[in-house]
Amino acid sequence: MVSLEQLREHETVRTDPVPESQALVDVRQLSLWYGTKQALYDISVRFPKNQVTAIIGPSGCGKSTLLRSLNRMNDLVPGVRVKGEVLYEGVNIYDPRVDPVAVRRHIGMVFQKPNPFPKTIFENVAFGLRLMGVKGSELEDRVVEALKRAALWEEVKDRFKKESGLRLSGGQQQRLCIARAIAVEPPLLLMDEPTSALDPIATQAIEDLILELKERYTVVIVTHNMQQAARVSDRTLFMHLGVLVEEGPTEVIFTKPKHPYTEAYITGRFG
């Protein structure tokens, strides 16, 4: 329908852009290559504090690559090369002096497929806290609080110290992974297709949770489900062929998109 060259001829369409003072993360002219293949093209965007930002677009458009750039998960891919800046609370996380492991302690991530450890529910959530040196009653208090925030506590409170996280249902496992991520109080939580492997009831529980989480955290979610993006997000980014085509308030993107390619995707004419 459209060539990369045509997309790159035009700047990103922005509606109500996020002021620098309200941004937790400020991406500046970010490009990324896997070997010789370029996956992201000169992306600049800000992610506002205590809001949910959804990233949408057809398969292979660079959604997950952009998401994983926000906590340097792409560093784990052989041959990756990055140009540009990702400022997290004003610090460029790609500065050579910055430890990527330290970055990931501040930025939690929840993956497409739940990945609980083969440990008890308690030990799953306690894992990151123990690495931080949290012990004793404080450790238990923070585990319980994280399970409550992840809307899992009432379902597991009678067995969380003895039952393996692997015995939970898929939806419960995903909420356990969210509890594990938020236990260490990361200001930023990244979610890569967090409900794609779940049934509708479990999906609803995760969506309700996302809306609650933004009171304490900044959330960025990648989703193929446009209805989900419309339900849970405050702002939406539309990507195509590694280019950020349009960004703005979710209501604008879904009801009055300004770029013809955004409108074509939203109305189902491609993707």
From Swiss-Prot:
Q: Which residues bind ATP?
A: 57-64
Kindly state which reaction or reactions the protein catalyses.
phosphate(out) + ATP + H2O = ADP + 2 phosphate(in) + H(+)
Primary enzyme class: translocase
Pfam families, alphabetically? Answer: ABC_tran
Q: Name one GO molecular function term.
A: ATP binding
InterPro entries found in the cross-reference section: AAA+_ATPase, ABC_transporter-like_ATP-bd, ABC_transporter-like_CS, P-loop_NTPase, PstB-like
Does Cell inner membrane show up as a keyword for this record?
A: yes
Task: Provide the GO biological process annotations.
Answer: phosphate ion transmembrane transport
Q: How does it sit in the membrane?
A: Peripheral membrane protein
Q: What is its main location?
A: membrane
Q: What does this protein do?
A: Part of the ABC transporter complex PstSACB involved in phosphate import. Responsible for energy coupling to the transport system.
Instruction: Name the family the entry cites.
Output: Belongs to the ABC transporter superfamily. Phosphate importer (TC 3.A.1.7) family.
Known partners and oligomeric status: The complex is composed of two ATP-binding proteins (PstB), two transmembrane proteins (PstC and PstA) and a solute-binding protein (PstS).
* NCBIfam families the record matches: 3a0107s01c2
Q: What is this protein called?
A: Phosphate import ATP-binding protein PstB
**Record organism:** Thermus thermophilus (strain ATCC BAA-163 / DSM 7039 / HB27)
